[in-house]
A protein has these predicted regions:
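ABC ATPase NBD coupling module
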Residues: 71-85, 368-378, 384, 388-389
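H-loop (His-switch) and adjacent beta-strand-loop-beta switch element
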Residues: 212-225, 511-524
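H-loop/switch region of ABC-family ATPase nucleotide-binding domains
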Residues: 199-200, 498-499
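ABC ATPase nucleotide-binding domains
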Residues: 236-305, 535-568
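Conserved ABC ATPase signature
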Residues: 138-142, 438-442, 446
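Conserved ABC ATPase "signature" region
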Residues: 116-134, 396, 413-434
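Catalytic Walker B motif of ABC-type/P-loop ATPase nucleotide-binding domains
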Residues: 163-166, 463-466
Length: 568
C-alpha cells in the first residue's frame, strides 16, 4: 500500500491563465526518499502543498491525493497534523513561540498529550538533534540554520510518517545546509520516515534520493532514479533546463564523455568521492598541465582608484548591552566590481548591507560614497519591495523612477518608454506571463525575479544584493549573471551577499568572508576558494591534488582535456 499517491491531480490558482499542476500522477512508499526538481515556477511548491491539507492553496483542482489509500480530504485533521510534517523555505515563517524548548513542545501540547509524554518526546528530540546547548535560548537569538533545525525537530516530535520539505536550505549557509540535509538523510535512514523534498541545489540531495521527480510546466516530465535521470539528461540536455543544476560531478564527466576523454560505458558519478575515483582511473598526466582561470569581466577598476562604496571601522550592535555584530569592519568596493560577501547565518552580512545603504546607523565608523551615486538594495525578503496589486504596476513604477536605459537604447522619459523598459526586463527575467499576477501569488523564485527586475529598473549606480540567486534555477542564475556582467561593464558597482558558492566562484570579481564581526579574508575567487574544505566549490574539491586552482566545472573540464591531449 502506497503511503502517498497522486492520481491525475490538476490545479489552477484563481484568475490564473494556465494550470499550475497538470495531470500529475505518482506514488511513494513508506521510507522512500524522493526529490522534486524542475525550473523555477514549474509547480514544485504547489505539488508539495497538495499533500498537506492545512496549507493547500485556494483554487480549482481535479484528481485525488491519497494518503494510505484514503483520499486526503477524508483523512482526520489529527492524523494529518501528526503524520504529515511540512518544513517551509523561510525558517522564520514556521516558528511560533519565544523559546526553543517551548517550540519543541508546542505541537505536542496542541495534541493534548500528557505532560510526561511531552517531556519525554521533547528530551528525545533535543538529544537527537544536538540542541542541548541552545535548548533554553530564545528563538530570536538563533541563527538561520538553528531555526530550520528547530522547525525540523518540532515536526519530528510529532512522530510523522511523511516529511515534506520545500527548499529547506535556500536561506542557509553551506555548512548549515549540509548539516540539515545530513539530518534529513539520517531521519530517513534510521527512522524510516518517508521524505518528499523540493530543491534547486541538487548537489547534496541527488545522491541520497531513491527517486527523482522532474517537473516541467506543471507536469511530471520524468520519474526515475538519480542515475538514470542524469544519464537521460546528459544525452539530451535540452530536455530540461535542470541539466545545468545537476551535481557538478555529473556535469563534469558528462561533458568529458561527450568529448571522448572519459569512457561512455561508465556511470556518471553523483558524489565528490566517486568523481575523484573516476578522475584517478583516467590516469591523465595532470602534472603536465596547469588549470587556467576562466575569463572574468575587465570592468573592475584598479584598487588605487577611489572606492565607489566604503565602510571604515564599522561597529554595530542591536541594543546597548547586546553583542557586537560588527567589530571594526573595513570593506571597500571598487567602481564596476562585483564583490561577493560570504559568511555563516547570523554573521552580520544582511546587517552590513542595511548599514551601507543607510537603513541602520553604526554606533562607530563611517560609510563613504559619492553623493551623486544612486544606491538600491535587494532585501532578503523581496515581499518588502512590492506595493501594487500586480507585477506590471510595480515594474512600471520602477521604470518611471529610473533615470536611464540599461536594457533599451533610447528612452524619451515618457510613459511609453518606461513601459518598453519594463516589458524588456520582464522578458529577460521570464516574467511576461506573470505581469497581471499579484506579487504575493508568485512562487518564491518568481517573486525573487520580479524583485530583481524592479531593482534593475531603478538605474542605481550601486546595487546591494542580499541573496539574489535564492529560488532561481541554474538557467536563470546564468541569465542573472549575464545581466550583472553587463551592468558591471557599464560601471555599476555591486556588493552581493550570497550562500551560493558556485555562483560566487563563477561570476564574482572578488570574494570576502565575514566572520566574528570582521572581514577575515578578501581575495580573487581562485585564491579565496582554493585549499578550503567547506567554503569551496564541488569542482574545487574534485580537482584538488589533480588540477590545483580549478574552482569551476568549466575549468576542470578544460584541464582534463589538456591532460588527455598530452597523454595522446
Amino acid at each position: 500500500m502506497a503511503l502517498l499517491r497522486f492520481d491525475k491531480v490538476s490545479f489552477a490558482y484563481p484568475d490564473a491563465g494556465k494550470r499550475a499542476l497538470d495531470q500529475v500522477s505518482f506514488s511513494m512508499e513508506e521510507g522512500e526518499y524522493i526529490v522534486v526538481c524542475g525550473e523555477s515556477g514549474c509547480g514544485k511548491t504547489t505539488l508539495l502543498r497538495q499533500a498537506k491539507p492545512e496549507i493547500t492553496p485556494a483554487g480549482a483542482g481535479d484528481g485525488t491525493v491519497y494518503y494510505r489509500e484514503q483520499p486526503l480530504s477524508e483523512v482526520p485533521e489529527l492524523t494529518s497534523a501528526m503524520e504529515i510534517g511540512y518544513v517551509q523555505q523561510n525558517p522564520d515563517n514556521q516558528i511560533v513561540t519565544d523559546y526553543v524548548w517551548h517550540e519543541l513542545a508546542f505541537g505536542l501540547e496542541n495534541m493534548a498529550l500528557p505532560t510526561s509524554v511531552i517531556q519525554r518526546k521533547v528530551s528525545e528530540m533535543a538529544s537527537f538533534f544536538g540542541m542541548e546547548e541552545w535548548f533554553r535560548k530564545k528563538t530570536s537569538e538563533l541563527s538561520g540554520g538553528q531555526k530550520q533545525m528547530l522547525n525540523l525537530a518540532s515536526i519530528m516530535a510529532m512522530n510523522p510518517k511523511l516529511l515534506i520539505l520545500d527548499e529547506p536550505t535556500s536561506m542557509l549557509d553551506p555548512l548549515a545546509a549540509r548539516n540539515l540535509l545530513d539530518t534529513v538523510a539520517r531521519i530517513n535512514r534510521e527512522l524510516g520516515v518517508a521524505v518528499l523534498l523540493c530543491e534547486h541545489r541538487l548537489e547534496d540531495v541527488f545522491q541520497r534520493a531513491d527517486r527523482v521527480l522532474l517537473m516541467k510546466q506543471g507536469a511530471v516530465l520524468a520519474d526515475d532514479t538519480p542515475e538514470n535521470l542524469t544519464f537521460t539528461l546528459q544525452k539530451d540536455p535540452t530536455a530540461s533546463r535542470i541539466y545545468l543544476g545537476l551535481p557538478g560531478a555529473a556535469r563534469i564527466f558528462g561533458e568529458l564523455q561527450q568529448k571522448g576523454v572519459c569512457p561512455t560505458n561508465k556511470k556518471l558519478p553523483l558524489s565528490i568521492r566517486d568523481a575523484r575515483h573516476v578522475l584517478k582511473e583516467l590516469d591523465l598526466p595532470f602534472e603536465k598541465v596547469k588549470a587556467e582561470p576562466e575569463k572574468r569581466t575587465e570592468a573592475a577598476k584598479s584598487n588605487k582608484e577611489k572606492p565607489a562604496l566604503e565602510g571604515k571601522e564599522l561597529w554595530f550592535r542591536y541594543d546597548e548591552k547586546g553583542k557586537d555584530i560588527l567589530r571594526g569592519l573595513n570593506l571597500s568596493v571598487q567602481r564596476g566590481e562585483l564583490l561577493a560577501l560570504l559568511g555563516g547565518n547570523g554573521a552580520g552580512k544582511s546587517t552590513l548591507l542595511r548599514i551601507l545603504c543607510g537603513l541602520k546607523k553604526p554606533f562607530r565608523g563611517k560609510v563613504k560614497k559619492d553623493k551623486e551615486m544612486r544606491l538600491a538594495m535587494l532585501p532578503q525578503s523581496p515581499q518588502a519591495l512590492f506595493v501594487y496589486d500586480s507585477v506590471w504596476e510595480d515594474l512600471l513604477d520602477a521604470a518611471k523612477q529610473g533615470r536611464g536605459a540599461r536594457f533599451v537604447d533610447k528612452v524619451q522619459g515618457n510613459a511609453e518608454a518606461a513601459a518598453e523598459r519594463a516589458r524588456e526586463v520582464a522578458a529577460k527575467l521570464e516574467l511576461t506571463d506573470k505581469l497581471t499576477s499579484h506579487p504575493f501569488d508568485l512562487s518564491g523564485g518568481e517573486l525573487q525575479r520580479a524583485a530583481i527586475g524592479k531593482l534593475l529598473l531603478q538605474d542605481a549606480d550601486i546595487l546591494l544584493l542580499d541573496e539574489p540567486t535564492k529560488g532561481l534555477d541554474a538557467y536563470l542564475k546564468q541569465e542573472l549573471a549575464g545581466i550583472l556582467k553587463k551592468l558591471t561593464e557599464e560601471g555599476i558597482t555591486m556588493l552581493m551577499v550570497t550562500h551560493d558558492l558556485e555562483f560566487a566562484a563563477s561570476y564574482a570579481d572578488r570574494c570576502a568572508l565575514l566572520f566574528d564581526g570582521r572581514i577575515t579574508s578578501e581575495e580573487e575567487p581562485h585564491a579565496f576558494f582554493t585549499g578550503n574544505r567547506f567554503y569551496t566549490t564541488t569542482a574545487g574539491l574534485i580537482a584538488e591534488g589533480y588540477l590545483p586552482g580549478a574552482i569551476t566545472c568549466g575549468e576542470v573540464i578544460a584541464g582534463c582535456e589538456k591532460a588527455y591531449a598530452k597523454k595522446m
